[in-house]
Amino acid sequence: MAVAEFVGPGEWLGAELRDSDAWRVPLTEAHRREVLAACDSEESFPLPTLAPTLHRVRDELMHGRGFVLVQGVPVEQMTERQCERAALGLARHVGAVVPQGPGARPLMHVRDTGADPSRAKSYQHSGRLGFHSDPTDVVALLCVRPAKSGGLSAIVSSVAVHNELVRTRPDLAELLYQPWWHDRRTGDGPDSFYAKPICTVDDDGRVSVAYGPDYLRSAQRGATVPPFTPAQEETMALLDELTNDTRFALTMDLRAGDMQFLNNHVALHSRTAYEDYREPHRRRHLLRLWLTTT
């Protein structure tokens, strides 16, 4: 098949945005008080002055660059239960919160459990996460506490990476539209593995990139999964090179109170490995939510 570049605001370069505040949304003191009050409200998290800002966040996610960093959520004044309520409440003004997999909860605690990174879910270990997308429209991460060191978040425009591949290696770009085997990490049986393309084009003619190299590689353990072809290996190596190129990637050091929103169709995200504190009450803790916007 012939592949083509896609033009739009979802194509951006990290090098051009690194010193920009255009993607940051700092909360005012009035907004912070409103969030605290909403945490104790019997209503459905009312945000009379902040809600319009969050609606603009949604618009930027769906029709703009595809990512926003909200800053200043007053987590330092909240209990863990209030942080959960704040994360859910803020997210619901952006989209519909959905379970994170069959039988899963709508809110996940991202903490190191000491699990093996090659077999565990990404929110359960402290190892490095390569650039990937989550299987939902939008992923939101509220930082309650950062790590002692490491744990940096990096994002990249998957549209920009796709277009670079089309320009430089159209033969490999074509492979992204063919089925690749993925690992659900739900066990060792055949139902744990499935095949789907990395790139698809939606009804509006926009490219959507669903990429998770860690899950592609771990799928190789499946008894019925064919080994990577040399061309697939080359494609993954080039994607790894491009996504980690500082020209494309934008790094964020999430601090307590930062809430990152990301459109998975047009952006990939990663995390560096991290070292945690020994004391449980100081350890890295993020809250993750999946949203739909349709």
Task: Label the predicted regions.
Residues M1-L50, H55-R56, H63, V68, ...:
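Active-site environment of non-heme Fe oxygenases that use a 2-His-1-carboxylate facial triad
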